[in-house]
Amino acid sequence: MRRRRRNRSPFPCGQPWTHVNSGITIPAALDELPRVRATSFAAPELDISQNFASEDGRESLTIQIFRNTNGSVPVWFAQAERAILLRADLKNPVLAVPVTAFTPPGQSAASGLKAVFAPEEVEGIRSTGVALFVVGDWYVKLRANSASLIPSDMSGWMEGVIAELTLPAGSAPAAAPIADCAARLDFPDTSADSTLPAAMLTAGVKDAAARIESPRWCLDRVVRGNQAVYRPDGASDRYLFAAGDSGKAFAVQPHGAAATRYHSINFLTADRTFTLPAQAALPPPQRLLDLAAAKRSVAASKTWPTP
């Protein structure tokens, strides 16, 4: 699978910038912090970030917009939280303001999530926060650091910063912090490719499978680092294996019935879907990693531009 490459993205100095795909406009400065860098991770503007900072570096903000190809706000917020906890320089920060839902500008439901952490004995960072919400087909993530704000003030500051964005009209479902699944998935002792004839391996193999949809997701397990398994609450035959905190994930789901049943594996990125060999039964997460490491992709389909 492709590595995430960073490219400096041109932006109008001192001018607002509009994300062409979503219509979101980001000002040249957020709460008087000037834009200092813009980065593109996947063209054309499928995964971008912009950084804002005070001259002395005591306050900083990062806005990231990445394509919504899978999961939900609770899923990708949980990944963003874990990314903070895994940062060695933050020294296992304490959750100071628990995960709270908020209503993004122009939306009617509390469809966004935010949280604030308080690093201990970390020079230059008194509080660090994250907020995430969805605008149509795009996730919007805010990261904020401050050397002066206490956690409760950081929480309010983030909402104030988000209010400075110009967002297109739209709606999104209410969000709630993700919870652990009631029971963990039970995987077979061995994993193997499906032995069905190639003609029967269509959905999710020859072509990308349909998106796994669910009004409510739960956390099945953290595999390691910021790799975690989520699934529709109550489902036992499918899951999403999130890799990192920017939208990349493996989607595993069943197809067919009885003797013709198999499980597809799709690796979802910002602009395409890679299909891996069909599996005879529900594969454990390590099987996905092994197949990806062995570069056993059988097909790739572009998902951008959308049909």
Question: Language-model segments: which ranges?
Answer:
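Short, hydrophobic/aromatic-rich segments at coil-to-beta transitions
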Residues: 32-36, 45-50, 107-118
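Short, surface-exposed coil-to-beta transition loops
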Residues: 45-49, 60, 123-129
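A short acidic-to-branched-hydrophobic micro-motif
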Residues: 48-80, 200-203, 210-211, 220-256, ...
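Short, well-ordered beta-strand elements
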Residues: 61-64, 137-147
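Mid-length scaffold segments of soluble, non-membrane domains
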Residues: 71-101
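Signature of long, low-cysteine stretches enriched in small and polar/charged residues
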Residues: 91-132
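Surface-exposed amphipathic alpha-helical segments
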Residues: 142-193, 288-301
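Extended, charged low-complexity segments
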Residues: 231-307
